[in-house]
Amino acid sequence: MATRSCREKAQKLNEQHQLILSKLLREEDNKYCADCEAKGPRWASWNIGVFICIRCAGIHRNLGVHISRVKSVNLDQWTPEQIQCMQDMGNTKARLLYEANLPENFRRPQTDQAVEFFIRDKYEKKKYYDKNAIAITNKEKEKKKDEKKREKEPEKPAKPLTTEKLPKKEEQQLEPKKSTSPKNAAEPTIDLLGLDGPAEAPVTNGNPATAPALSDDLDIFGPMISNPLPAAVMPPAQGTASVPAPATLSTVTSGDLDLFTEQTTKSEEVAKKQLSKDSILSLYGTGAQQSTPGVFMGPTNIPFTSQAPTAFQGFPSMGVPVPAAPGLIGNMMGQNTGMMVGMPMHNGFMGNAQTGVMPLPQNVVGPQGGMVGQMGAPQSKFGLPQAQQPQWNLSQMNQQMAAMNLSSANASAGFGQPPSTTAGWSGSSSGQTLSTQLWK
């Protein structure tokens, strides 16, 4: 379909061009050949703009395409440009241009060779060419070009108007984007991880000593005898000072539970730096020592041996003396102040008294008296003996201390008790008064 339509269009154009050429041939000058003046020319040199006969057409072809381009009026197809050139020039104008200097008595040649020489002199050598006419023709050509430009100029401004409107619209669309972009940049960036939040301000409760104390409380393996607390971190006595519990708890929850801080490691390093030879030796000095009150009697400072007695064959030797709390077991401290604590008792109690300073000789347990008083007595719900609380005074303590010194000469391999007392693990404790009124 497309080829047919193209062919039809081409035919219509060709017909139109033939009509134009036929009109041009009807002119008086165009009825004759431009070179030999033969009648009825059917060929034309469209670049020169002249109608010629068939013989002159052959000579024009021999000149070359750069000089003359020949076409048949009826057999060839013409283009609009070629038709325009023929309309502009014609035989009359061509003679005025190419034969301006031709002599008046000049006869046109009739033979082929003479015609060829004349055609070469006329179009190739431009022997008779009017130079002034060239300027006229150039001016006419310039005028025609100007007219064509003027005809195209009103059409051209219409196109830039559309192109100018589009950039304006694009600029209007870009302006709101530019105005919105600073707003997005001005918004503060929010850290989603929350590590740099406003909660970075340190919480201070006014107690600078709580940090090392709390780090030590979190230590599972300390403080022990091999790793004692420094003097600056020693807890105060129970009866002398009272620390408010809510304040310490708040510091624990606020500071030590923070997984991203290094307070525990820093406090441990501070505590280790404070440990020195003097601070460790000061723990074993003869100064005032802390005493924990017993269950049945007041706190006392009692010396113990540095080694376990070797005469006790039924009990293993202990490397470190652990003092027993006085009064935990009824009448335990009657006269046996030098006993070793840590022996397994059937009621589950172990001693917890403070260590003393005065050493005792080995194989010495104490004067004759009950090692563990009233062990055979019926026990209470919590494993405590139902014996009455002994009443101690300073005189009895002095007597017992003197008895401890005398007992070194009477030491024996056994428990050092008469048969009446060793059999039942119960003995009379001198200087003790048992009364049931204290329990009321």
Curated annotation (Swiss-Prot):
Tree of life domain: Eukaryota
Molecular functions (GO terms): clathrin binding; GTPase activator activity; zinc ion binding
Residue spans, zinc finger C4-type: 33-56
Regions annotated as coiled coil: none
Residue ranges of the region described as Disordered: 140-211, 410-440
Listed Low complexity bias regions: 420-440
Membrane topology recorded in Swiss-Prot or TrEMBL: Peripheral membrane protein
Domain called Arf-GAP: residue spans: 18-143
Subunit structure, interactors included: Interacts with ARF6. Interacts with clathrin heavy chains via the clathrin box-like motif.
Protein name in UniProt: Stromal membrane-associated protein 1
Organism encoding this protein: Mus musculus (Mouse)
Gene: Smap1
